[in-house]
Swiss-Prot record:
Keywords carried by this UniProt record: Acetylation, Actin-binding, Cell projection, Cytoplasm, Cytoskeleton, Isopeptide bond, Nucleus, Phosphoprotein, Ubl conjugation
Lineage, uppermost ranks: Eukaryota, Metazoa, Chordata, Craniata, Vertebrata
Protein name: Actin-related protein 2/3 complex subunit 3
Function: Component of the Arp2/3 complex, a multiprotein complex that mediates actin polymerization upon stimulation by nucleation-promoting factor (NPF). The Arp2/3 complex mediates the formation of branched actin networks in the cytoplasm, providing the force for cell motility. In addition to its role in the cytoplasmic cytoskeleton, the Arp2/3 complex also promotes actin polymerization in the nucleus, thereby regulating gene transcription and repair of damaged DNA.
Gene that encodes the chain: Arpc3
GO molecular function terms noted in the UniProt entry: actin filament binding; structural constituent of cytoskeleton
GO BP: any one term: Arp2/3 complex-mediated actin nucleation
Pfam families for the chain: P21-Arc (PF04062)
One CC-aspect GO term: lamellipodium
Compartment(s): Cytoplasm, Cytoskeleton; Cell projection; Nucleus
Length: 178
């Protein structure tokens, strides 16, 4: 079974480094254009997460795949936090905190995927990439809470938390031991 790839890459999609700046249906401020379709890259990443997380190798077919990879790795980080939460409201607070926490971007020493991501070419591109990744993180965390928490019990679903120990591409956005 092959890995799932993003279908959202258009020829006129703007790039930051070698990552696609894709439109989002987001309530958070950031450089991403507004998405008018029903599905955006965050929906796609959440939908494909359970299948893609099993892959140790992932062939990048376009720049949107790099965005998909980042969100997939971020979902893994989110699940580590969400499994410890007792309620959806606690989970939303954790996701907000994780979303705005200082994080490395491509080209910086702590970023785990510097081999496949180009670092920003200028200070302006650096700021735009950081803002876009933060917008992705915030939106992903919020939407993931909607999927992970069971509305009846207000507890994290075991069908999501069972993926906590899985590492997509044998990588993690957090450092070793975190």
């Amino acid at each position: 079974m092959p890995a799932y790839h993003s279908s959202l890459m258009d020829p006129d999609t703007k790039l930051i480094g070698n990552m696609a700046l894709l439109p989002l249906r987001s309530q958070f401020k950031g450089p991403a254009p507004r998405e008018t379709k029903d599905t955006d890259i965050v929906d796609e990443a959440i939908y494909y997460f359970k299948a893609n997380v099993f892959f140790k190798n992932y062939e990048i077919k376009n720049e949107a795949d790099r965005t998909l990879i980042y969100i997939t790795l971020y979902i893994s980080e989110c699940l580590k936090k969400l499994q410890k939460c007792n309620s959806k409201s606690q989970g939303e607070k954790e996701m907000y905190t994780l979303g705005i926490t200082n994080f490395p971007i491509p080209g910086e020493p702590g970023f785990p995927l510097n081999a496949i991501y180009a670092k920003p070419a200028s200070k302006q591109e650096d700021e735009m990439m950081r803002a876009y990744l933060q917008q992705l993180r915030q939106e992903t965390g919020l939407r993931l809470c909607e999927k992970v928490f069971d509305p009846q019990s207000d507890k994290p679903s075991k069908w999501w938390t069972c993926f906590v120990k899985r590492q997509f591409m044998n990588k993690s956005l957090s450092g070793p031991g975190q």
